[in-house]
């Protein structure tokens, strides 16, 4: 039997499918809805303690984000995912728990002042740590016998480091059915990671459709475009602020920035500095470095073999502590600042926006999809004033979107 656990029409819903084979109950993905309200519609409509296995296509929160909630509701089964997905979930689920607790604390201060009921975080750090112990890291392209009647294989989906489509074979009463879960599939030619692999046959295929209504042309060459934006911004004396998801998009931007340096695309500002200001992005970048053999594209592997770090360059700095983060805003020279979260709903990016949105010389460059209702969406749609940390901030900076990168 097969069921879709969530049937809601929202912008980026959490992905979750339910399978039953003989007496085994299985979830494929267990994602959290993304958007401005963390506390709406985030229930798990299955009995968590009855679930035997979870198969995870990739680490993005809309596919993995409710795993700690599943654990807190009693799940103690095994979670199968690729090695890179397991490692990324290790940082992303803990980060998600941290955001939950921070967000709940902030909301509750407001609620207490208004005499309203308090919210409880969906899960805490103990739930995130607990569920991570149930992960079983798997290799690509190997058939794995899960239990009697259930076999799976992870195939590279080319969407994110470690991402996969999952082939599932279910056998009941000598009849075998093959179901393929596409996961999110990359559209090829991404920097760093391999192109999606093909799957030849299946009885049933479930396909993700977040961008299903769009035809993706071949991606443009981003390095020259990015160089032009940096040149224009630095010539004005401003900073280039890039809100970016810590995992995946940040590393892609580092790849393009490295090309700008190595190919001398910005002769006027050859020695420019760039900051990654997100502890999660710094950890994720380290996981990318470890995953060269399994996940990198041939082009990226060649660079590594030549002793070139595909996502590193002179002038790249990382800030992990909040003091280091604050110092960025006291720099006298123009900087490229990559920070999270990508939709500007939380995280250090909000501090950088506070310091740069009012400056006509600065540029805010969006490089990912913006859910309606988020601060990022409002800025892209021409908001003239936004509220940050209780202050009204005028928007005078140049607001740009890098098309086709989503």
Predicted regions and their residues:
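Hard-cation-handling environments
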Residues: 229-377, 387
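Metallo-beta-lactamase
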Residues: 96-160, 293-332
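Short beta-strand scaffold segments in enzyme catalytic cores
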Residues: 14-19, 163-168
């Amino acid at each position: 039997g097969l069921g879709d656990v969530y049937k809601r029409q929202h912008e980026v819903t959490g992905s979750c499918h339910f399978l039953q084979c003989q007496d085994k109950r299985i979830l494929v993905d267990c994602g959290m809805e993304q958007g401005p309200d963390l506390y709406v519609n985030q229930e798990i409509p299955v009995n968590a303690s009855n679930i035997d296995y979870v198969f995870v296509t990739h680490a993005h929160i809309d596919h993995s984000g409710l795993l700690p909630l599943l654990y807190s509701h009693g799940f103690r089964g095994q979670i199968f995912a690729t090695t890179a997905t397991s490692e990324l979930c290790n940082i992303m689920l803990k980060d998600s728990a941290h955001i939950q607790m921070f967000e709940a604390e902030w909301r509750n201060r407001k609620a207490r002042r208004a005499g309203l009921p308090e919210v409880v975080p969906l899960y805490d750090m103990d739930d995130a740590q607990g569920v991570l112990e149930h992960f079983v890291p798997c290799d690509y392209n190997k058939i794995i016998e899960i239990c009697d009647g259930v076999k799976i294989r992870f195939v590279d989906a080319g969407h994110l480091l470690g991402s996969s489509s999952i082939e599932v074979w279910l056998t009941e009463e000598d009849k075998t059915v093959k179901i393929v879960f596409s996961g999110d599939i990359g559209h090829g030619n991404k920097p760093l990671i391999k192109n999606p692999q093909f799957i030849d046959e299946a009885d049933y295929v479930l396909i993700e459709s977040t961008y299903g209504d769009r035809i993706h042309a071949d991606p443009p060459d981003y390095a020259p475009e990015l160089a032009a934006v940096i040149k224009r911004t630095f010539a004005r004396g401003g900073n280039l602020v890039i809100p970016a998801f810590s995992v995946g998009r940040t590393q892609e931007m580092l790849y393009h920035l490295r090309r700008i340096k190595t190919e001398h695309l910005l002769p006027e500002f050859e020695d420019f500095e760039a900051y990654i200001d997100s502890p999660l992005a710094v950890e994720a970048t380290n996981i990318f470095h470890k995953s060269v053999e399994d996940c990198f594209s041939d082009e990226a592997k060649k660079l590594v073999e030549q002793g070139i770090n595909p996502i590193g360059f002179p002038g790249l700095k990382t800030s992990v502590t909040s003091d280091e983060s604050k110092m960025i805003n006291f720099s006298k020279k123009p900087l490229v600042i990559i920070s999270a979260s990508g939709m500007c709903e939380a995280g250090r990016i909000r501090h950088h926006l506070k310091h740069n949105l009012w400056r006509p010389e600065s540029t805010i460059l969006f490089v990912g999809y913006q859910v309606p209702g988020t601060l990022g969406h409002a800025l892209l749609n021409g908001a003239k004033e936004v509220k940050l940390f209780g202050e009204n901030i005028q928007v005078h900076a140049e607001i740009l979107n890098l098309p086709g990168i989503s």
